[in-house]
Curated annotation (Swiss-Prot):
Species assigned in the record: Saccharomyces cerevisiae (strain ATCC 204508 / S288c) (Baker's yeast)
Biased segments, Low complexity type: 49-58, 717-726, 794-808, 842-854
Listed name of the protein: Uncharacterized protein JIP4
Compositionally skewed regions (Polar residues) per UniProt: 115-131
Domain of life where this protein originates: Eukaryota
Single annotated GO MF: RNA binding
Length: 876
């Protein structure tokens, strides 16, 4: 397996992690609602809130190995906690009822027209309103909500009743249900969590009272409240500009938003609440693992939220009031449905059993009634026993992952509905301080938050006013492997079930929201997984095919035995000992660097401004030392500490490592001559035959020297033999496009047909060119043309210059080799052509031929009649 495949397996390790848990490690819990029903059946006396929360209450856990670490408690507070010590905190203190003045009589209670409790009495409503709150309340959002619209027109006398002891209480206290949802909740707190939280709360209150002793800037952190204007003072008049001046009045939502933002609230005296949402996607569980193992502290409140979709069929009509009535009557007639509805009171705000829930079994009433008798539905196609079982599994998983030295409060809630709605309800109820979410983005260059995205994590960060922790699931493999090592498979079970090599990671057998389990990864205990992944990785093909066939198809072949956990030779390195040595050095250097960084953090002698520079120096020094240690390995190879074969293997391994790091570059640097942009790009795989063909083709277009100059011929032959590359033609800047083929150089033939001996001598020196050169009768032979080539090594080839005029008369070649220059013969009167000069007065001047044509042979000049002396007379 190559490095990329191995990294992908590590990043996806959270999908295949399992936990092996003993039965005695699970926390036995008790259904508090069932216990309360049992107590009520035995004793009709009302139980106070303190008696439920008392650790010495009659709620005991069953079983031989029962453990009372976590005690039942309420999920959230429905009453404002505005003071340090509330009367509700005192044990055995019941609700005293609505306080009415002493002059109130029973006659006024039954008087609907006048009296203290009449609808027109403003004094009563001013002191006992639904939304009354105390000044300086430190718990925002936990106040009583206003009455629903359906009960605003009810007379005030119908909201009270007289109890058995004569006390007048309100029937609708504390509030009517405002959050109606289908949810089941388990809430447990550690045994000493309540005592620790009371101690911490008193410490916070003491620091608030002594601000100047504990805070450097108390006036900024705790600004004084503005005093209210006295009755005699003139009230401040707010300026409201007219509408015609361009002012747009604020809407109701804008006014409400402005009022909420401008309202000053105090610091909450509730525990630090951490909300974590999980679903069927496996990467969401990584965020829960990280929060339970890293984020939580003592006295924290961890809330685990999970939602399930509704299974109600919406394709049947519900408009008929009679059908709705029959369904409600059918639910009320079934005693099991009534008892199920009583047990579904998961929240203290949802106490009414008259909440209408549609059956989701079918549109026909007969089918609904028949199936409802055999299937007790809690809501939307789910049974209460099924949800409670999953709820218990989630709670067991949470209590198992939490470290033993953490004293926290745990709330696990399963809601039926859409994710957005459930999150909004959970935020409004629990008022979390932090939200923990996960993402599949893992690259360091990739942003974990995208502002224009509809993903849940992006919406939480952009729209919700809550600090959010984003956990990249694909980078948390160290955390998951640590969990696997802590909850590994017992040795006895491993010996019974394993008959051969077994992969460490394996898939989960169920896709539901049950407890994920972890299997053991066969690695050394001192391995650092970010570096040792280079050493201990499975092979791409796999040597143990028998064990692979025995394993299931959904198991990940991530780790094998020690014999098979070496990478392929071509993957990273070609020697096992070199890899082990590199990993050991990297692990040792990392541990040393981590220790130095930890010492720098706890060193009080270092100024705060220099601490980061000190850490940077430690990192740079460790990196340089590690580089020197790697060089020492290569030095030991060069010094002959190992045999030749092993040294060659190590060297090839390092070269392969360099190739992987550089992205496919050649392992060794080969010095190549500098190439010019004017060079012809030759094929690098050229053979000797191609170079010979280039040499022969070059010799065919060379200049043919005169027969009387054998020295020049030898020089030209040696020069052509030394060249190995095909040249490229380079023209001068004065060459015109209209010149055509004439710009290629002199095309006048140098062959002389007068002397056959000279032809034989020339053939003796250039026999290979005469055999290869094409000879077409009536056409001239091409003259040689030199070019500029940079690839000629140390030879200085100059550019060939071509002169052009209106009529191309002569061509000069400027070569670097002086031996190649051929002196042109002197033209005398004996060589004049008939067309070289015209008749007339100036015919006696000697001139050269103006015709550039080479069709005229030199033997024709001998047969041509020659002109004599002056005025055509012969020479005397």
């Amino acid at each position: 397996m190559v490095v990329r495949d191995q990294d992908e397996a590590l990043r996806n390790s959270y999908k295949y992690v399992k936990l092996y848990v003993r039965q005695d490690q699970l926390e036995d819990t008790v259904d508090i609602l069932a216990k309360q029903d049992e107590d009520k059946s035995n004793n009709d006396d009302r139980r106070s809130l303190a008696s439920i929360l008392d650790s010495s209450s009659s709620v005991k856990k069953k079983g031989k190995g029962s453990n009372e670490k976590y005690l039942p408690c309420v999920s959230f507070n429905t009453v404002p906690r505005s003071r340090v010590s509330s009367p509700l905190d005192e044990e055995k203190r019941e609700f005293p009822g609505v306080q009415i003045s002493a002059d109130y009589t029973m006659e006024e209670y039954y008087d609907d027209e006048s009296g203290f409790t009449s609808d027109n009495n403003a004094d009563y409503f001013s002191g006992n309103s639904y939304s009354s709150r105390r000044e300086g309340s430190a718990s925002p959002g936990r106040y009583s909500s206003p009455p629903p619209a359906s009960k605003r027109n009810i007379k005030i006398g119908k909201m009270f009743k007289i109890s058995e002891n004569g006390k007048i209480v309100r029937e609708d206290y504390p509030t009517t249900p405002t959050d109606i949802n289908d949810a089941l909740v388990i809430s447990r707190a550690y045994a000493n969590w309540r005592q620790l939280w009371i101690k911490k709360k008193n410490q916070i209150d003491h620091r608030l009272e002594q601000k100047r002793d504990f805070f450097n800037y108390p006036t900024i952190l705790f600004p004084p409240n503005k005093k209210k204007s006295s009755e005699g003072a003139t009230p401040t008049i707010k300026f409201n500009p007219p509408i015609e001046d361009g002012f747009t009045p604020l809407t109701k939502s804008q006014k409400r938003k402005e009022r909420v933002l401008s309202e000053k609230v105090g610091f909450p005296n509730t525990p630090r609440t951490i909300l974590c949402h999980i679903s069927g996607r496996k990467h969401t569980w990584v965020a829960l693992d990280w929060a339970l193992r890293t984020l939580i502290q003592n006295t924290d409140h961890i809330v685990v939220l999970a939602n399930l979709p509704r299974l109600t069929k919406n394709n049947f009509e519900d408009n008929d009031s009679m059908s709705e009535r029959k369904r409600m009557l059918m639910m009320m007639d079934d005693s099991r449905s009534v008892s199920s509805a009583r047990r579904s009171r998961s929240r203290s705000r949802s106490r009414s059993i008259c909440t209408r829930r549609a059956l989701s079994l079918g549109p026909e009433e007969s089918d609904n009634k028949l199936k409802h008798q055999n299937f007790i539905e809690w809501t939307s196609g789910y049974t209460q026993n099924e949800i409670e079982r999953k709820l218990q599994d989630l709670f067991d998983y949470v209590t198992l992952i939490i470290p033993q030295d953490r004293s926290v409060k745990v709330t696990v809630e399963i809601l039926i509905g859409k994710t957005k709605k459930t999150l909004l309800e959970a935020i409004n109820i629990y008022l979390p301080d932090f939200f923990v979410s996960s993402t599949l983005r893992w690259e360091r260059t990739d942003s974990l938050v995208r502002w224009k995205s509809n993903f849940l994590t992006d919406k939480l960060c952009t729209n919700f006013p809550i600090p959010t922790f984003i956990v990249p699931a694909k980078r948390m493999f160290d955390l998951e492997i640590d969990l696997q090592k802590e909850f590994k498979e017992p040795e006895v079970t491993k010996q019974k079930n394993t008959s051969g090599p077994k992969p460490g990671f394996s898939h989960s057998k169920s896709a539901d929201a049950s407890i994920p389990t972890i299997s053991n990864i066969k690695r050394k205990q001192d391995n650092d997984y970010s570096i040792d992944s280079l050493c201990y990785a499975p092979e791409a093909n796999g040597a143990n095919n028998s064990s692979r066939e025995e394993a299931s198809d959904d198991e990940l072949n991530a780790f094998k035995d020690d014999e098979n956990d070496v990478m392929s030779v071509k993957s990273l390195t070609s020697n096992i000992s070199v890899k082990e040595k590199l990993c050991t050095m990297a692990r040792k250097r990392r541990k040393s660097m981590a220790q130095q960084l930890n010492d720098a953090d706890h060193d009080s002698s270092i100024p705060p401004g220099q601490r980061h520079l000190k850490k940077l120096n430690i990192i740079l020094e460790s990196s340089l030392k590690f580089s020197l240690e790697i060089d020492s390995i290569t030095d030991s190879i060069e010094n002959g500490d190992v045999d030749e074969k092993r040294a060659h293997s190590m060297e090839s391994g390092f070269e392969e490592l360099k190739r992987v790091i550089t992205g496919g570059a050649p392992p060794r640097h080969v010095a190549t001559p500098q190439r010019s942009m004017l060079d012809v790009l030759d094929n690098p795989s050229s053979s000797r035959s191609k170079s010979k063909s280039r040499s022969s083709s070059k010799s065919r277009i060379r200049d043919k020297s005169k027969p009387s100059s054998p020295t020049a011929t030898d020089i030209n032959s040696s020069a052509s033999a030394s060249r190995s590359r095909s040249p490229q033609i380079k023209f001068a800047s004065s060459v015109k496009n209209v010149d055509g083929n004439a710009a290629l150089g002199a095309i006048k033939s140098r062959h002389s047909l007068d002397s056959p001996g000279d032809q034989q001598q020339q053939h003796h020196h250039h026999h290979h060119r005469d055999t290869d050169q094409l000879s077409v009768p009536g056409l001239p032979h091409l003259a040689p043309s030199k070019s500029y080539s940079v690839s000629s090594g140390n030879k200085d080839s100059s550019l060939r210059k071509v002169s052009s005029s209106s009529s191309l008369r002569k061509v000069k070649s400027n070569d670097s080799n002086s031996g190649k220059r051929i002196k042109k013969p002197v033209v005398t009167s004996a060589h004049l052509k008939p067309s070289s000069g015209g008749g007339g007065l100036f015919s006696f001047f000697k001139s050269k031929s103006r015709s550039p044509s080479s069709f005229r042979k030199e033997d024709e000049s001998k047969n041509t009649p020659k002109r004599g002396g002056l005025f055509g007379f012969g020479r005397l």
